[in-house]
Amino acid sequence: MLKTKRKLTKAIGVALSISILSSLVSFIPQTNTYAAGTYNYGEALQKSIMFYEFQRSGDLPADKRDNWRDDSGMKDGSDVGVDLTGGWYDAGDHVKFNLPMSYTSAMLAWSLYEDKDAYDKSGQTKYIMDGIKWANDYFIKCNPTPGVYYYQVGDGGKDHSWWGPAEVMQMERPSFKVDASKPGSAVCASTAASLASAAVVFKSSDPTYAEKCISHAKNLFDMADKAKSDAGYTAASGYYSSSSFYDDLSWAAVWLYLATNDSTYLDKAESYVPNWGKEQQTDIIAYKWGQCWDDVHYGAELLLAKLTNKQLYKDSIEMNLDFWTTGVNGTRVSYTPKGLAWLFQWGSLRHATTQAFLAGVYAEWEGCTPSKVSVYKDFLKSQIDYALGSTGRSFVVGYGVNPPQHPHHRTAHGSWTDQMTSPTYHRHTIYGALVGGPDNADGYTDEINNYVNNEIACDYNAGFTGALAKMYKHSGGDPIPNFKAIEKITNDEVIIKAGLNSTGPNYTEIKAVVYNQTGWPARVTDKISFKYFMDLSEIVAAGIDPLSLVTSSNYSEGKNTKVSGVLPWDVSNNVYYVNVDLTGENIYPGGQSACRREVQFRIAAPQGTTYWNPKNDFSYDGLPTTSTVNTVTNIPVYDNGVKVFGNEPAGGSENPDPEILYGDVNSDKNVDALDFAALKKYLLGGTSSIDVKAADTYKDGNIDAIDMATLKKYLLGTITQLPQG
């Protein structure tokens, strides 16, 4: 992925705006303004907000609504001794870039500020507020002391060189900061805007949190205002370089004014206006681009128009919206043949839907020129309908007709081999994600390597979410009741492949390879073992003690591999097994070597004997007779003692392991309500930090709701012994 090409700068914008302007040979598609909904805007809004749950980094909450994401980035900030866990991953990668992240959070807060009734009615207020708080909790961590701000976690180059799920990242994730000696005005001001806008929407429900946000917003704004420099903002270069900071300062100051009612901030916001970008060789405030992470003066001028009613801001925002709709002095943004207002190849839908949100906000204000109200509202509807399917296909993952199936997103893809081509399908549906969008001729290919048109990102959904709230408010649609992204597991998460490495008159040598291809969620396994079962009737008939057979291993990819001697399973039927223990080996779905461990082991009768017969062995059945391995099911695999793959022969011990404290899910040597909470979190979506063997309170080899019910009965005193079953 050439993420560098997602970078937008005003310099590029000026150059491109010249090439994309077109004569007004046609007008934007006419619609019946806010007619009965063409699409289910409620469902689209619901899923667009859910998208941000899939982007979360850090310690995920117990009430999460999926079963394929888990804690990740839990060491973020450890290199500088600061807890920098949390926040959102930027796009289809795992870097946390605070400039676009803070822009995104502020845009979501703006939408909630404008249309809280729509969120209340649709039942989405909790979810959008959770998302806004998730981002801003992280920003507060990034400002551990006044004058210091960590603006990025992760190295773009190292991050982009690996293709795998966030939960099993192994690369170093450096932290980068700005301060007085190395300033970053744009990112500090942008984050101040996010925190201040969060304070606005949390003021009534959580005034203490709102005040905390204001405190950090003021600190970051002061840093940005005093420095007026981006000289220290270097780590994001080539990804999210900033072309200016005065727009961010105005944006932040407006939100601080709304949060504090301190007119000093309103004055500050206006004081930066002369430094905003201008159209080439004019004194006209730039209008031939759109609201985005690198240029927020459009949002600032719209809010200033509403707050001050000054003609300067009204004229400027209307020129911008006219450029996107009817045109200005004979020029306007390009339109595709099917009606998308097309600004730029990277995130074309992001730009169109964000401008649609601004158009919707402004059209509802009484200060909007009356003759333009319907034009702006029509624009809002046409652009959102394009994204939702007016061309015959949806551009939103998990929504509508023919939605994208292969977005450029590592964790949603779920590769265990560090390859975007394996598997050939996406294991997860990242609901609500708006893909980049078509080219200027409506062309679009739904391919995972198409990072230009098919990547997804936090900022792509920001204005889109706000526009959907507008459409829901006016045209309705029903969110899906109790919607969750609980997926059916579509493949065995841990498997074993084996073959016959070598054989002789007195021995069998097995080549076995264990694979971790977990995805619900992806996780590191370090307690894997497997059993090779044998029918040793011929050994017993020869008068030999089966336990005297010799086992050995001449090759293992793991440093911690332990091959047991022959152990009894069902003595009455002469069934025995060898246990191969890989405890201590970190096997994870992160590469062709990382996801597997190979072991070659031998079971031998005494030298010179000829009674050895492997063909009646349970685990020999289905085993390839060459060293070319294939998946086998009669060599069961265990994770921390719990069978996760394959079959066992009949028999075996039915007695509980006396060393296991059943019900002690969190391994604190007690069985109490904390264990119930830990098991509930595991079942709601997954955490790998439980003792799965102790959690099997019903003793059926599965961890499920039956175990939770059994544990509950035990805690309530209905039953007095664990395990049951």
Curated annotation (Swiss-Prot):
Key word Membrane present: no
Originating species: Ruminiclostridium cellulolyticum (strain ATCC 35319 / DSM 5812 / JCM 6584 / H10)
Active-site residue numbers: D93 (nucleophile), H408, D446, E455
Keyword Hydrolase attached: yes
CDD domains: Dockerin_I
Described function: The biological conversion of cellulose to glucose generally requires three types of hydrolytic enzymes: (1) Endoglucanases which cut internal beta-1,4-glucosidic bonds; (2) Exocellobiohydrolases that cut the disaccharide cellobiose from the non-reducing end of the cellulose polymer chain; (3) Beta-1,4-glucosidases which hydrolyze the cellobiose and other short cello-oligosaccharides to glucose.
GO biological process, one term: cellulose catabolic process
Lineage: Bacteria, Bacillati, Bacillota, Clostridia, Eubacteriales
Molecular function per GO: cellulase activity; cellulose binding
Signal peptide: 1-35
Keywords of the record: Carbohydrate metabolism, Cellulose degradation, Glycosidase, Hydrolase, Polysaccharide degradation, Signal
Domain CBM3 intervals: 489-650
Protein name according to UniProt: Endoglucanase G
Top-level taxon in the UniProt lineage: Bacteria
Pathway info: Glycan metabolism; cellulose degradation
Family per similarity comment: Belongs to the glycosyl hydrolase 9 (cellulase E) family.
Limits of the Dockerin domain: 658-724
EC assignment: 3.2.1.4
Catalytic activity: Endohydrolysis of (1->4)-beta-D-glucosidic linkages in cellulose, lichenin and cereal beta-D-glucans
